[in-house]
C-alpha cells in the first residue's frame, strides 16, 4: 500500500497555525482573569462600611491607677443633685491633678482596663487618688476590672465628647436672687472654656468664675439681676448665646439654646 507523503512546508504551516491559536486563547484567558479580579476588587471596595467616628478625644490617653469608691452621684464635688446620672455611664472621681477647678465636672471618659473599655462621667474629685488616677463607682469598676474584687488596677482613660442629643442645662443654686448669681451647667457635651453673662443685650459680657468645690459659676461679687443673656464658650471654641436666662428660680434646670 502506497503511503501518502505530506510536503514539509504543509507540516510547518499547520504547526505554526496551532501555536498562534494557543497563544490567542491563553492571552484571552489571562485578560479575562485580570478583568474579573479588578471587578472583584471594585465590588469589595463598594461594599465596605466605615465605622462612624465619635469625634476626636478631648485629652490625651492617660495611664494611671483605677480604684473603687461607693459613689453617691448627687453629693460629690460636682453636686449633680438635679441632673440624673446618664444611663449606661458609671460615676468617676477625678484625681486632683486633672480636676482643673471643677472644669471636668460632667466630662465623659472612656476608661480601659482588664475587662475592656467602658464610659463614665466625672461627678466628683478624688484628693486621695495618685496623680492620673481615677475612682470608679461599683458598676463601672466591675466592668473595667473584669469583675475583680475591689482593689487597684491599671487603667487608661481619656476625655471624649458625650454626644448628648439635647441642649445643655442651666441650674441656679439654692439662695440665688437678683443680688446673688450662681449658675451650674449640666449635660454639656464637652467641658466648657468659659461662661459669661450680659445684662445689656450683648453689648458687654461679665465673666463668671467656676467654683472648684461646688461646680457653680459666679461673678466676682453681687448679683446680675433676675434675667440675663448667657454666653457659653466650649473647649473647642464653639460659642452660643441663650437669651433671657432666669437667674433667680432655685434648682430648676432650664435648657440652653444649644450644646457643645
Model-derived features: positions:
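Mature exported/compartmentalized surface modules and terminal targeting/interaction regions
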Residues: 2-107, 116-118, 123-132, 139-260
Amino acid at each position: 500500500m502506497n503511503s501518502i507523503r505530506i510536503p514539509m512546508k504543509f507540516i510547518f504551516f499547520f504547526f505554526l497555525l496551532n501555536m498562534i491559536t494557543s497563544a490567542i486563547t491563553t492571552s484571552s484567558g489571562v485578560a479575562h482573569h485580570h478583568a474579573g479580579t479588578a471587578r472583584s476588587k471594585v465590588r469589595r471596595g463598594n461594599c465596605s462600611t466605615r465605622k462612624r467616628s465619635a469625634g476626636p478625644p478631648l485629652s490625651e490617653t492617660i495611664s494611671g491607677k483605677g480604684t473603687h469608691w461607693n459613689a453617691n452621684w448627687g453629693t460629690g464635688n460636682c453636686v449633680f443633685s438635679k441632673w440624673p446620672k446618664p444611663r449606661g455611664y458609671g460615676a468617676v472621681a477625678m484625681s486632683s491633678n486633672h480636676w482643673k477647678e471643677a472644669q471636668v465636672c460632667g466630662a465623659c471618659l472612656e476608661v480601659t482596663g482588664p475587662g475592656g473599655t467602658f464610659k463614665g462621667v466625672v461627678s466628683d474629685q478624688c484628693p486621695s487618688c495618685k496623680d492620673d488616677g481615677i475612682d470608679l463607682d461599683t458598676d463601672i469598676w466591675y466592668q473595667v476590672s473584669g469583675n475583680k474584687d475591689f482593689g487597684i488596677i491599671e487603667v487608661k482613660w481619656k476625655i471624649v465628647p458625650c454626644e448628648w442629643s439635647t441642649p445643655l442645662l442651666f441650674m441656679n443654686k439654692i439662695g440665688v436672687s437678683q443680688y446673688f448669681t450662681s449658675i451650674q451647667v449640666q449635660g454639656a457635651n464637652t467641658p466648657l472654656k468659659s461662661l459669661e453673662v450680659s445684662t445689656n443685650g450683648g453689648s458687654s459680657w461679665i465673666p463668671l468664675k467656676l467654683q472648684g468645690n461646688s461646680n457653680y459659676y459666679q461673678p466676682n461679687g453681687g448679683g446680675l439681676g433676675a434675667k440675663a443673656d448667657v454666653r457659653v464658650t466650649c473647649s473647642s471654641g464653639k460659642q452660643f448665646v441663650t437669651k433671657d436666662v432666669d437667674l433667680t428660680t432655685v434648682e430648676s434646670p432650664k435648657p440652653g439654646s444649644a450644646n457643645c
